[in-house]
Design a protein with these regions (language model features):
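HhH-family (HhH-GPD) DNA N-glycosylase catalytic core used in base-excision repair
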Residues: 1-268
């Protein structure tokens, strides 16, 4: 177990921020994260966080995953103090971080997210992981299922995916998995693209609209200018930014501000 003291890090806020569907609270101040084929249990008491994982995994995977090298107080300090709404949102969600998650997992997760609530999204992802992922055992003895590879999903049938409660989204997942396997879309190339270029490429995938493309850019490519607009965000923009969100002021971190707003609207 590794014990780290840090600021602007709150497991509860991250878990409820809508960006990660395989993070769950499993006890008082205790959380579990499955990312790709990795497993982690964490506890937090104020600013003290305990990571139950090998030190090697923490250094080479979880530091990047939780964006621990970034000082999020700088984002909070960027908020215009005259913007009372965003100031309140930043204060409420000051422990949120933009997780650096696996691109493939984010593409499939946000395809599944369409017209879905968080509970159902999590269940769908758990279903496909159990059906098509590899069963594994963590260093602490916990059994879990890795997120399925593109190859595993490409070999599935639409009916099998529908049996995982994906509904009409099954055809989106199957089409995307096969495009990745056949080389019609390169995940590595997406990592090298600008936000605008990556967004345009993602919009070419079957079933991907603007919100889903922006979610993938923000949470799968860590492109912090992406600003996904769902119902919660649209309502906030209409109520508090009738002249439009101040994009120029927050250039380079619009996605961080989006998360503060999303969490604030969700928790009000």
């Amino acid at each position: 177990m590794l014990t780290i003291e840090m600021d602007n890090f709150n497991l509860g806020q991250i878990c409820r921020s809508g960006q990660c569907f395989r993070m769950d609270q499993i006890g008082d101040d205790r959380y579990r994260v499955i990312a790709g084929d990795k497993y982690l249990e964490l506890t937090q008491e104020r600013g003290i966080v305990n990571f139950s994982c090998p030190e090697e995994d923490f250094i080479f995977f979880w530091i990047r995953y939780f964006d621990l090298d970034c000082d999020y107080s700088e984002y909070i300090n960027m908020i215009n103090p005259r913007d009372k709404y965003l100031t309140a949102a930043g204060e409420m969600g000051s422990g949120i971080r933009i997780l650096q998650q696996d691109l493939w997992e984010m593409i499939i997760s946000f395809l599944i997210s369409q017209q879905n609530n968080i509970t159902r999204i999590k269940k769908c992802i758990e279903n496909i992981s159990r059906e098509f992922g590899v069963r594994k055992t963590s260093s602490t003895g916990a059994e879990y299922y890795a997120f399925p590879t593109a190859e595993a999903l490409a070999l599935a049938t639409e009916e099998q995916l529908r049996e995982c409660n994906l509904g009409y989204r099954a055809k989106y997942v199957l089409d995307t998995a096969r495009k990745v396997c056949f080389g019609d879309i390169s995940l590595n190339s997406l990592h090298d693209m600008t936000y605008k270029a990556a967004r345009k490429e993602l919009l070419g995938l079957y079933g991907v609209g603007e919100k889903v493309a922006d979610c993938i850019c923000l949470f799968g490519l860590h492109q912090l200018d992406a600003f996904p607009v769902d119902t919660h965000i649209r309502q906030a923009l209409d109520a508090h930014y009738k002249r439009g969100f101040p994009n120029r002021r927050y250039k380079g971190c619009r996605g961080v501000m989006q998360q503060y707003i999303f969490y604030y609207e969700l928790m009000k």
